């Protein structure tokens, strides 16, 4: 089944270096179910508040580069495999994801971005492919096209109908015109990855994945008819709670949730600092890259004037060129893989703090009604029904938030472990390539004898 919620326009395929199409993954009904690269972390029962511990990584045997054994400052042998095989650590790190994927029953992938040019607007749509064995779906496979505003609609609906859960963030909608080209291949691919991660987080959630709006988003041929529905009753009730408790100061906030809020404030602050510094590093690397591109050809031009030094100078020029290529790859990886994860978790922390404020509002409503009931306790012997309902809401909120916090901490540990392993892997490759380039011209320089 296929569908689109956007006006009919002429789509144009955009190049993408994204993941494999979902059609290349075996269906869960087959003998060997496919596994997603971004499966949610499971198993570890982390505490609600942690100092971001680093799980043990797989042990690897040290290898050598140019017959030299390297070691870390603490004496631990370092893995110095060649660039062609230096990603083996990441491959082993993802084994847990693959095994976890075998137990899943809902697979969602965002790919195949296309540009639509209409009279009034130009926009990008993405293919959202679904494979599932769940009985809530009429068919085992779906494929629909969605644009960014459709993802935004889904997230708003999840916030309205699942107020006690952390909703994954979407990538920023607005970009600065003239600074970022929102139709460029790089921007579209970065957004595609973020949207894919957004849907995968929802699909992996034991509650959000069963939300009716998520089902509609994945399957509806015409999403516009569903988007036109009015504000839900639950949303209106939420507004009423905020109005009733706007002047009430919370008295007995659980210490664990106060600690969570403090942790998220510090976490977002640290990530914000990393984000700003990383942007400066990327800027400096780009400037350095531009200088290198001018630096290398100078030796090549010089070699034409020096017959005796022709080969060594050409070698240095080629070496600088190889270093340029390696640095360009390192910078692109930092921009396209490292930065989006940092920004996602900054947005995630802000979203989580919003949910915690909603929890406080529900507790404030409960405390206000409890105090009002206590003043009338002489007139009635039983606790009013509305007070009991408020108490149930608070307990439900607390239970859901604790479960989601544990899940978020597990996902965060896995995401940052993979992120930092990727950073280490890319830096190893960069320095290996530079080392190989410079070592390759040493024999050329040594063989060049001084003229007699």
UniProtKB/Swiss-Prot annotation:
> Could you state one GO cellular component term attached to this entry?
phagophore assembly site
Compositionally biased, Polar residues: which spans? 1-20
* Comp. bias intervals (Low complexity): 76-90
Annotated signal sequence is none
Say yes or no: keyword DNA repair present. Answer: no
Q: Which Pfam families match?
A: BAR, PX
State one molecular function term (GO): phosphatidylinositol binding
Q: Tell me the GO BP annotations in alphabetical order.
A: endocytic recycling; mitophagy; piecemeal microautophagy of the nucleus; protein transport; reticulophagy
Residues of the region (Disordered) are: 1-90
Superkingdom classification of source: Eukaryota
Q: Which keywords belong to this entry?
A: Protein transport, Transport
- Is ATP-binding included in the keywords of this UniProt record? no
Q: Which InterPro entries match?
A: AH/BAR_dom_sf, BAR_dom, PX_dom, PX_dom_sf, SNX30_BAR
Where does the PX domain start and stop, copy by copy?
Answer: 104-225
What's this protein's family per the entry?
Belongs to the sorting nexin family.
Its annotated function is as follows: May be involved in several stages of intracellular trafficking.
PANTHER family xrefs: SORTING NEXIN-30 (PTHR45949:SF1), SORTING NEXIN-4 (PTHR45949)
What is the protein named?
Sorting nexin-30
The taxonomy runs: Eukaryota, Metazoa, Chordata, Craniata, Vertebrata
